[in-house]
Amino acid sequence: MFEGLSPLARDARSWPFEQARATIARVLRVRLPDRADQDAAKALIDAGKTDEAVKAYPALAKAVIFETGYGPSGLPHLGTFGEVARTTMVRQAFRALTDEAIPTRLIAFSDDMDGLRKVPDNIENKQPLIEDLGKPLTVVRDPFGTHDSFGAHNNARLRAFLDGFGFEYEFVSSTDCYKGGLFDATLLTALERFDAIQKVMLPTLGEERRATYSPFLPISPSTGKVLQVPTLERNVEKGTIVFEDEDGSKVEVPVTGGHVKMQWKPDWAMRWTALGVDYEMSGKDLIDSVKASGAICKALGGVPPEGFNYELFLDENNQKISKSKGNGLSMEDWLRYGAPESLSYYMFQSPKSAKKLYFDVIPKASDEYLQQLDGFGRQEPAKQLDNPVWHIHGGKPPQQGSPVSFSLMLNLVSAADASTKEILWGFLSRYIPGASPETQPLLDRLAGYAINYYEDFVKPSKVFRAPSDQERAAMLDLLAKLKAMPAGTQDAELIQNEVFEVGKTHGFDPLRAWFQALYEVLLGQSQGPRFGSFAAIFGIDRTVALIEEKLG
C-alpha cells in the first residue's frame, strides 16, 4: 500500500513523518554498529532504495517494533485509543518512507499481570473486586460476568474497539509473556543486574520506600496477591529470590515462569529489552518514568525506544482523564455522536498540546475532518501526505465526503425537530440531487450522529428568546426578502448575501450579533453554521414559516 511513496514522503513535515524519521535513525544506529554502514544505509533509504539497503545490510530485514501500552485496571477510554491511533500513524509514515521494504509490527501490550490496587469508581458490582484486591488483573474475577477475569474483560473491550476501527495490531498479554517464558531470559538478566536497577530506582524514591523497594514483585503462593515486599536473598545461579510471605514464612521462588512480575518502571524497561521495541510514545506525565526505564533498559543490555511525550487529555473541568475514575468521554460516547474518522482526526491534531476531551469537541472535530477530506483531492500529491485524512485512512481516504457539515445537520435537526433519519432525508434529498442513504453513506451516518447529539445535548439546553425591536424589524425585512425569492430557491450564497445586507441595513455592529440573534430567536441556540446554507437546505418556505412562528 505504501510502496513507491518515499520520493513524496521525503519532504513531508507532519509530525508522524518526523517521528518516523527519528525511528529510522534509531534502527540504523542500533542494528548497524559501524558509522560508515549507518551513513551508507541512510543514503540508500533517502534515495528511495530501501530494498537495496536491506539487501546490503541483512540486519535491517528484522521487523521494526512499534508498541503501545495499556493498563487494564479500568474501562478503556479514548486516551488509550489515541495512543494506538497515533502510533499507527507513525508506523504508516515509516512504511511510506521505506517503501515497505523493512517489515513492521505494532504491538498493543496489556500490563494485565499488574495487581489490582483499587476498585474503579464507575463499576456497580464492586464486591468481587474488593475481595480480589492485590491479585493480578487476570486473576481478579470479572464483575460483569462475561470473561474469565477483570483483566480479560477489559482487554476484550480494548480489542473489540481497535478491531472496529480496523487497526492492524498484535495484542500481547503481560500475563502470557511472564507465564509463557518470553520474558525469562531478560528476567534472569535483571536478577543478575539487580544492583544496577536499584542504582537507578532508589534515588527516585522516598526514604521509607527505599528501605523496602525491590524491582521484583513475587506472587504469593498462599494468597495469589502481587506483593510489594523486600527481596531478602538472591540466587543468580538458581534464578531465584527469597521473600517473606504474608503469613511470615520465608519463600523462595524463581523469577521466571510467572512467579514474579516486575515493578512497573523496571517492567517497562524489561519489556522494551525482551521484545526489542523500537518505538513507543507516552503521556507527558511519564517523562521521568521514561528516563528511569530508559536507564534500566540500558542496564539490561537493551536500547530504549524512540518516541515522544504527548500532552494529556483533560475533561471539561481541566482534570486529567482517568480510566479508574471514568471521567471524560468513553469510546462508546464518541461513537454515539461522531464518526470514527472524526475521532481519529482529533487524535492527529497537535499531540503535544493539551486537549479537552468532552462532548463539545465532537461537532468541531467532525466539521474539520470533513473540510480536510473535501480538500484532499485538490492537493498536490506531496501535500496530500501532510493532510490529516492521509494518516487517518492509511493513505487511501474515501473519494466522497459530505456535502453537508455536521453543524448544519445539527441545525436542520433542530429546526425540523427531526427524530429520525427519514425526516432528515426528506430535506437532504431535495437539496442534493440524486442523494440517498445508499449514494451518500457518510451523510447518512452524520444524520444519525446529529440526531443523537441534538437529543442529548442541544435540545435540553435550548433557550428561545423574544427579539428586540431592532431584531424584529430586521427579521420582518428578511421575511419580505425571502418571500420575494423564486419558489424552491436553493442558492445558499444568494440567501446569505440577503441576510448579510439586512443586518447591515439595520445597523448591527458587529454583524455577528445579527446572526446570533437569528439563531437565538429561531432555534434557541447561540450559534450555528452559515444561515444561508441552513435556509437553503431547510427550504425557503419552511424558513419563512419558522420566522413567522417565532415573531408571532
Curated annotation (Swiss-Prot):
Reaction equations catalysed: tRNA(Lys) + L-lysine + ATP = L-lysyl-tRNA(Lys) + AMP + diphosphate
Residues bound to ATP: K323
Renumbered ranges of motif 'HIGH' region: 72-80
Recorded GO MF terms: ATP binding; lysine-tRNA ligase activity; tRNA binding
GO cellular component: cytoplasm
Localization, UniProt: Cytoplasm
Classification via InterPro entries: aa-tRNA-synth_I_codon-bd_sub2, aa-tRNA-synth_I_CS, aa_tRNA-synth_I_cd-bd_sf, Lys-tRNA-ligase, Rossmann-like_a/b/a_fold
Lipoprotein as UniProt keyword: no
One Pfam family named in its UniProt record: tRNA-synt_1f
PANTHER family: LYSINE--TRNA LIGASE (PTHR37940:SF1)
Name of the protein in its database record: Lysine--tRNA ligase
Organism for this UniProt entry: Caulobacter vibrioides (strain NA1000 / CB15N) (Caulobacter crescentus)
